[in-house]
Amino acid sequence: MSEKTSSLKLIPVMLAFFAMGFVDLVGIASNYLKADLGLSDSEANIFPSLVFFWFLIFSVPTGMLMNRIGRKKTVLLSLIVTFLSLMIPIFDDAYMVMLISFSLLGIGNALMQTSLNPLLSNIVSGDKLASSLTFGQFVKAIASFLAPYIAMWGATQAIPSMELGWRVLFPVYMVIAVIAILLLGATTIHETKEEGRPSTFGECL
């Protein structure tokens, strides 16, 4: 694989790393939801906890799924789940609706964290893999860094918010998720075959 081809294949993968950073919007969203819905501390703290809960539940099954359907398809699935999680709050911000949204965001993040690094290893290898992983984490950090500012700009009407206020954060990141889905879906990535049969859930435990 030529260096130019590898660089082009990295674009959708780095967009996926950016999408991985969407999960950090839960923290700032919890603060706004607490004020908007008049939630108690315990009710608001459930939102960030959901992310870790679903990662705990889905991390092992995702590894098994990835062995069966492949790394690229698993990352695509994670992006689709993330897209759905970002679309839901555009229409409503009721407490149960946001619980569902953040649950999907946590599930998508669990799928992505388990499969994205292995997918990257099929594009670059050796010394370049380490630097690419580092750059991916940098891209992820950009998404985490921007989330509170986009929410703040929406809340203060500093940017067009489509009457969503701070929730303009969701359609902005949703568009990026759609771009990542389309680009990754159109990118051909040769995946190395896993030797042996796929592990069962019992064997993983």
Where does each model-flagged region fall?
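Residue-level signature of mid-helix packing/kink "hotspots" within the transmembrane helices
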Residues: 24, 52-60, 145
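Helix-loop-helix hairpin linking two adjacent transmembrane segments in secondary transporters
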Residues: 127, 131-188
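Flexible cytoplasmic inter-helical loops of multi-pass small-molecule transporters
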Residues: 185-204
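Cytoplasmic helix-loop-helix junction between adjacent transmembrane helices
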Residues: 101-138
